[in-house]
């Protein structure tokens, strides 16, 4: 399933500052993400995320990202932060992901040592995660976190998906136009591509990224 006509969704992930969240809303970003995965330099505590959530603009989704967290940890985040969407980057199965009664995205690792072209096919993914709201294809390898700043070969994306998909992994203002034109994603997910340092967003990069996404959308309309 491709995105709706000429409207690429934008998610800024790894948020750690309320000011960055406010700016994301002003720029028309569709979703902001908080990371709760152990070992991530962008990880925040549930109480911190709850406080920053107050800075989100109306109609902006709040996404909680996990990687092999326990069920208790996910429940605490759901209770404390009240996210609208969950995102799983680990070995979680469909039963685990859907057990929190919230829509979820399942990340698919596309790194050099990750899912190969044969395994990352639409049928396999959709049979494994029949209840996902969508897939997110990222450049990290299995067991690793996102935000690496590395891209992957976009031609390896599976075809024939019946769910929306987001593209992630090394996307910046310099390549997001080409990424959208090449893959026609439902949305794009960026973290390091709009940062000065892990978790510290750069206002100029954020603005430029959004501008390039909209330029790509206009290109698709022409």
Curated annotation (Swiss-Prot):
The family database entries (InterPro entries) matched by this protein are listed as: Aldolase_TIM, PRAI_dom, RibuloseP-bd_barrel, TrpF_fam
Keywords attached to this Swiss-Prot or TrEMBL record, sorted alphabetically, are: Amino-acid biosynthesis, Aromatic amino acid biosynthesis, Isomerase, Tryptophan biosynthesis
Q: Could you say which EC number(s) this protein's record lists?
A: 5.3.1.24
Q: Its annotated pathway?
A: Amino-acid biosynthesis; L-tryptophan biosynthesis; L-tryptophan from chorismate: step 3/5
SUPFAM superfamilies referenced in this protein's UniProt entry, alphabetically: Ribulose-phoshate binding barrel (SSF51366)
Single Gene Ontology BP annotation: L-tryptophan biosynthetic process
UniProt keyword Amino-acid biosynthesis, yes or no = yes
- A single GO molecular function, which one? phosphoribosylanthranilate isomerase activity
One Pfam family of this chain: PRAI
Write down the Gene3D superfamilies for this protein, in alphabetical order: Aldolase class I (3.20.20.70)
Domain of life, per the record? Bacteria
Reaction catalysis annotation: N-(5-phospho-beta-D-ribosyl)anthranilate = 1-(2-carboxyphenylamino)-1-deoxy-D-ribulose 5-phosphate
Q: Which family does it belong to?
A: Belongs to the TrpF family.
Record-linked NCBIfam families: PRK01222.1-2, PRK01222.1-4
Q: What is this protein called?
A: N-(5'-phosphoribosyl)anthranilate isomerase
Q: Gene behind this chain? A: trpF
